[in-house]
Structures are given as C-alpha cells and as structure tokens.
Amino acid sequence: MKFIAENLTKLRTISPLVQNITNYVVMNSTANTLLALGASPVMAHAKEELEEMIAISSALVVNIGTLDEYWIPSMEKAVKIASDLKKPIILDPVGAGATKLRTNTALKLLDIGNVSVLRGNFGEISALLGEHGKTKGVDSAVYDNNEALNISKNASKEFNTVSTVTGPIDYVSNGKEIYSISNGHEMLSKVTGTGCASTSIIGAFLAVEEPLKASVSGLVTYGISAEMAFEESFYPGTFQAKLYDWLYRIDEKLILEKAKVNRIDI
C-alpha cells in the first residue's frame, strides 16, 4: 500500500511530538521506539502541565497499564483537553476485562472525549463490548480470527472510533471498511510492552494521516520491522534491540515489498 510508505516519509519529515500518558512498565521502551521511528516522545503526567504540553503536541497517547488515584484524573483531563484542542487521541485499554477498574476507566475515557483510535488485543476490546472471559491479565487468552474481525467492526460502531484489534492477524475498522494486516512476528509476544509500543507508533502516524490509514500505517511499519529483526536475532533480548534498529532502518522500499494488507468492504 503506497500510502503507508508515504506516511512514513511524512512522519520523519516533521518528527511529530507525541504526548504519552503511559505505564511505568513500558515508558522507556516506548520512548525509544518513537525515537527510532523518527518521532519525538514526551511522557508528561502532571495535571498542572497537561494543557500546555498537549497544545504543542501532534497527538495524545493514553495507556491505562498502571492505574492509580493520580493517573486516572490526569488521563481524564488529558482526553478532555485534547478533544477541545482537536488533537488526535489513541487509547490503549491495557488489561480491560481483567478488573472492573481497568474496564470502567477505559469506558469512561471513551465517553469523555473524541477518541480517534482504540487499540487493544482481542480480549481487551471484547471486554469493552461486554464479552467477558477473553482476557488473561493484560494478555488476550483466546483469539478467534473471524470473531476478531467482527469485534473490530462492532467496536468501531459502538464507540464511534477507529477500532484496532491486534493479534496473529490485526484488524482495523472505521465501521464502514476493514483492513486486515498479517505483518509481525510471534517473538513480539516474548518482549514486554510491544503492544503498547504499537499504540504509540499509531499515535505518531496520527500526526500525518486520518485515523484508519494511520492505524494501518503504524501496524504495518511495526510488523515489518519485527519480521526483519527476527531474521537477525532469535532471542528476546537481542530481538528487542534489533527491533529498534529496524524501526530506524525501515524505508519506503521495504514497506512496498513486504506489506501484507487486505482491504475488506463491509
């Protein structure tokens, strides 16, 4: 898909500032992921500076991986500010379905503002739609290909957003059309925070593209980088380092050669 390659070039040209309210576990790796790709990360959580920080940012990433009584109000305020400023927002409902706190927080954030993209695994998005039993901790316990497609479509319509359900095959839907993406590698599941990193990558692409194609661009770019990284390293530690390298090295030519994307009309 030519638009994916073109979007990568646009992203690197402007190096968008991406404001992240993300979790303690992945903060460092997410920042390094964005830097390797060509974006500029900032991780600001204090309520007192959110308005100024979001005003100068190109997109807002909200990740609910480590919630507490301080972070939840910051997330709520950030989503409200970004909505008022018409900044694109991507929400990662980490662990939705595992606890009521996570599920209810994600649903409230979806209700507060105009979330551009909802990105989660099969179990998390299922839980937000009220289908229980598909989340194991923060990981998806059960994956069904056909059901994942339907969940992506249904979540988009339910929450009026682009819904991205990631798994062995990723599905991205705006309620009218769906893209399926087969890029990626199973080694990503052996490194913590790779799903969170993909969310932030989509956030960076939101600076240069509308939500549906930004999501496709982010997932394909990350997936191809993972495939190339595994060709050079078969173990989790060095795979992560190689993943940074390939996010830095990936270019338009490689995307055009290796993108595995199908567009599905609903």
Curated annotation (Swiss-Prot):
Keyword Metal-binding belongs to the record: yes
Superkingdom in the source lineage: Archaea
Key words of the record: ATP-binding, Kinase, Magnesium, Metal-binding, Nucleotide-binding, Thiamine biosynthesis, Transferase
NCBIfam families from the UniProt entry: PRK09355.1, thiM
Record-given protein name: Hydroxyethylthiazole kinase
Task of the protein: Catalyzes the phosphorylation of the hydroxyl group of 4-methyl-5-beta-hydroxyethylthiazole (THZ).
Gene source species: Methanococcus vannielii (strain ATCC 35089 / DSM 1224 / JCM 13029 / OCM 148 / SB)
Name of the coding gene: thiM
Cofactor: Mg(2+)
Mitochondrion in keyword set: no
GO molecular function per UniProt: ATP binding; hydroxyethylthiazole kinase activity; magnesium ion binding
Residues that, per the record, bind substrate: M43, G193
